């Protein structure tokens, strides 16, 4: 284990860091990089998790539960306390104690910005698809001989991790727009996947939400580039607003959307993968792009990653090879397993657009098999999002053959009167069952499925735990 007095390449403020909520996807990635760069890390979280266990194995000191004494785990005490204000209340006893002691309290984005300093920075933002597109970009660069540092919101299939301190000069990361913290960064290359209304509980209006993307684009380094998916109306409008700004804008999308730098000409589902025909402005002839993940939206994400990788100097053939081998990201249409002819996938989709995209991919998988039904187990995420998008969720989920709706996963929110999973279930036109008792879900779903059916558990909460339970129940009923 690292000891006090050792050498690091970290700024003084980040050499001994205590992290409140260390097990989360974003926080655990920061902890990994700090440890890799020679820092000392302690932390706390509300419960054990894969992230907590992995960080302990790398030398982090971690407690379950929150107590002021947690700040004494590092010899000499922490030089900074890091948290994410979206999940941790200011009344947290460790944050209160840090302020009492005069220890700087930093938010995760500010720390990530410090870690990216001195690198060529490539970032992906947008309402949906950030984690997958960022991961595709990382893999494309790795297959081109780069060793980028990276921080991403999910575990890469190939790397098995959500963060890495690389030996190269580039750093790839997501830029989360949900709380405006992406304005901490000064990137060189930015990919914008899409822009549509979300996180209105924080921004208050669609206009304020949209504006943060304009402001972020204004922070791109002179000589850098903005890569935009013009299939999406919100992202296309951003590109149009910036057309006379002097910023170089690269556009990608489908045919019929104007002169593009990368065009998706054709796309064909092949099992749980796909093959696409694409055209690049720099190439005389169409090219074949193969993917190991399903869904037309994934092909568009891959085009954005391809353009960004090429901007960073990556070889085209190597990029295409990397994209062909991309295994996906944990909880992004991830195969959990199969039992008695029933396949179960898990997906993070928690916005109507994401639900539609995932169901399109699910439907293609079912149609390719030639039999079976598409079944969704959906858990609404946040009361505010549920009440805002109930009808849109209902319309999106109605593309399934059967839907099971769980109660709302509250996360950081307090309940809203009259809002529950039934609010969404009532808007679904397909056969639907509302299941407020989480413990009864696996058995109820297993009783409904038949060989050939494909089930996807969907949402940003603990619905992810149900996939294996459903498979176990299916096996038990054989």
From Swiss-Prot:
Keywords: ATP-binding, Cell cycle, Cell division, Cell shape, Cell wall biogenesis/degradation, Cytoplasm, Ligase, Nucleotide-binding, Peptidoglycan synthesis
A Pfam family it matches: Mur_ligase_C
Main location: cytoplasm
Subcellular location(s) per record: Cytoplasm
Purpose of the protein: Cell wall formation.
Domain of life: Bacteria
Enzyme Commission number(s) from the entry: 6.3.2.8
Protein name: UDP-N-acetylmuramate--L-alanine ligase
Phylogenetic lineage: Bacteria, Bacillati, Actinomycetota, Actinomycetes, Mycobacteriales
Biological process (GO), any one: regulation of cell shape
Family: Belongs to the MurCDEF family.
